[in-house]
Swiss-Prot record:
EC identifiers of the protein: 3.2.1.1
GO molecular function: 4-alpha-glucanotransferase activity; alpha-amylase activity; metal ion binding
Protein known as: Alpha-amylase-related protein
Cofactor note: Binds 1 Ca(2+) ion per subunit.
Sites where the protein binds chloride: R205, N307, R342
One GO cellular component term noted in the UniProt record for this chain: extracellular region
Major localization listed first in the record, in broad terms: secreted
Family: Belongs to the glycosyl hydrolase 13 family.
Complex and partners: Monomer.
SUPFAM superfamilies, A to Z: (Trans)glycosidases, Glycosyl hydrolase domain
Gene Ontology biological process: carbohydrate metabolic process
Superkingdom classification of source: Eukaryota
Protein's organism: Drosophila ananassae (Fruit fly)
Origin organism lineage: Eukaryota, Metazoa, Ecdysozoa, Arthropoda, Hexapoda
Length: 493
């Protein structure tokens, strides 16, 4: 009897963790956007006015719980919890709940960035949070939860990143490290996550997951509630979980410890796609992109060109400040059949600590748009760049098709088909791409969705004529604004 019961428990745990890889997208939608530091009311409006109509699948939102107030209001204060009250500069609980409902109503899921590893960093004296809660971080006292010193690991620094004990029990950049093996801590974290599930979220991005033991996270994930059916989720649906695990391939704490619990952020994807489109690697090598490069299995990998952390670091990672290469890399990301895709929506920054756009009272301001829909007041809004939202539509149009008919020039001009539904070509050389190429599309005239749109039966940008054999003449000049061309069946004239 005991062996049978144990087997049943193991089977249930396995099925539960597999379910945590399902993002619960509507229809053929399959791209998440990170609206970094946006207010809840603005996200609700964006879901209704832009994300839903453009076919985005979901939004990753900034941390929702009360955080410490830091001088100058740097973005990273959101990653220093004071309590689990749902009051931040993005809004209060009522505004958050309204946003979740309105986004779900138009088929856009909400994924919350959650902080289960730690509370705030050190602070002289009494710290005050965004909901007015007081805490004394130096004594590990957080009455708003409440947590006291016994709920944390003993203080120590991470000096050796190859020491598992230090990585998982010492303080990440001085942040007070919670003990997730404690029943009390587990109960408070589960209570917090369950409340968000009740409000209708579809899942969680788990910050600093590698700094928590996989066994502790497994317990927490398996104990939280099923998704709320009142928000359109099926019965017994589990929250989608994607975990921040930075693993460059030589880490003592590896991504493979977490990829069965949920998806994992594939940081090597970000680094290598940046290398390629910066010209440090020929694009021809991208034919084997994905697992052929040693990345995680497609359904386990949360993929991105940049995120809110690494876009601020020097190195190979691309960001909005290199727009041509960034748009090419994003087009490839969304066209190639690998990973669970997330695109970034940033605000402008001059240094690592730059605050989001705010007024004189340090209140986050709403994005404003020009006549073409681009943001103009400190918000970058890459997701509103035509070259990016058009590729979200491309990805929807080609969902569940295979890559075929790869072509390259032996260097950094490439093209490929997605079944008979889509075609992408990229030119990252310093000379023109002018070639008859197999598009795999039915005969007809197609709009290049990178440079224009299909409006009232005609293209606002350039078009490509595809013959009865599927071939079309493709031209991408070396000096062209975008360096990429994309055709799909939903943009046929």
């Amino acid at each position: 009897m005991f062996k049978f019961a144990t087997a049943v428990i193991l089977c249930l745990a396995a099925s539960s963790t597999l379910a945590q890889h399902n993002p619960h997208w509507w229809g053929n939608r399959n791209t998440i956007v990170h609206l970094f530091e946006w207010k809840w009311s603005d996200i609700a409006a964006e879901c209704e006015n832009f994300l839903g109509p453009k076919g985005f699948a979901g939004v990753q939102v900034s941390p929702v719980n009360e955080n410490i107030i830091s001088a100058g209001r740097p973005w990273w204060e959101r990653y220093q919890p004071i309590s689990y009250k749902l009051i931040t500069r993005s809004g209060n609980e009522q505004e958050f709940a309204d946003m979740v409902r309105r986004c779900n109503d138009v088929g856009v899921r909400i994924y919350v960035d959650v902080l289960l590893n730690h509370m705030s960093g050190d602070f002289d004296g009494i710290a005050v949070g965004t909901a007015g809660s007081e805490a004394e971080p130096s004594k590990k006292s957080y009455p708003g939860v409440p947590y006291s010193a016994q709920d944390f690991h003993p203080s120590c620094e991470i000096t050796d990143w190859n020491d598992r004990f230090q990585v998982q029990q010492c303080e990440l950049v001085g942040l007070k490290d919670l003990d997730q093996s404690s029943e009390w801590v587990r109960s408070k974290l589960i209570e917090f996550l369950d409340h968000l599930i009740e409000l209708g979220v579809a899942g969680f991005r788990v910050d600093a997951a590698k700094h928590m033991a996989a066994d502790d996270l497994s317990y927490i994930y398996s104990t939280i509630s099923d998704l709320n059916t009142e928000h359109g989720f099926p019965h017994n649906a589990r929250p989608f979980i994607f975990q921040e695990v930075i693993d460059h391939g030589h880490e003592t704490v590896s991504r493979e410890e977490y990829n069965q619990l949920g998806a994992v952020t594939e940081f090597r994807f970000s680094e290598e796609i940046g290398n390629a489109f910066r010209g440090n690697n020929a694009l021809k090598w991208l034919q084997s992109w994905g697992t052929g490069w040693g990345f995680l299995a497609s359904g386990q990998a949360l993929t991105f060109v940049d995120n809110h952390d690494n876009q601020r670091d020097m190195g190979a990672v691309l960001n909005y400040k290199s727009p041509k290469q960034y748009k090419m890399a994003t087009a490839f990301h969304l066209a190639y059949p690998y990973g669970i895709s997330r695109v970034m929506s940033s605000f402008a920054f001059d240094d690592h600590d730059t605050a989001p756009p705010q007024d004189e009272q340090e209140r986050i301001i709403s994005p404003e748009f020009d006549e073409e829909g681009a943001c103009v007041n400190g918000w970058i809004c890459e997701h509103r760049w035509r070259q990016i939202y058009a590729m979200v539509g491309f990805k929807n149009a080609v969902r569940d098709t295979e890559l075929s008919n790869w072509w390259d020039n032996g260097d950094s001009q490439i093209s490929f088909c997605r079944g008979n539904k889509g075609f992408l070509a990229v030119n990252n050389n310093l000379y023109d791409l002018s070639q008859e190429l197999q598009t795999c599309l039915p005969a007809g005239v197609y709009c290049d969705v990178i440079c224009g749109s299909l409006v009232d039966g005609s293209c606002t940008g350039k078009s490509v004529i595809v013959d009865d054999s599927g071939f079309g003449y493709i031209h991408i000049g070396s000096e062209d604004f975008d360096g990429v061309l994309a055709l799909h069946v939903d943009a046929r004239v």
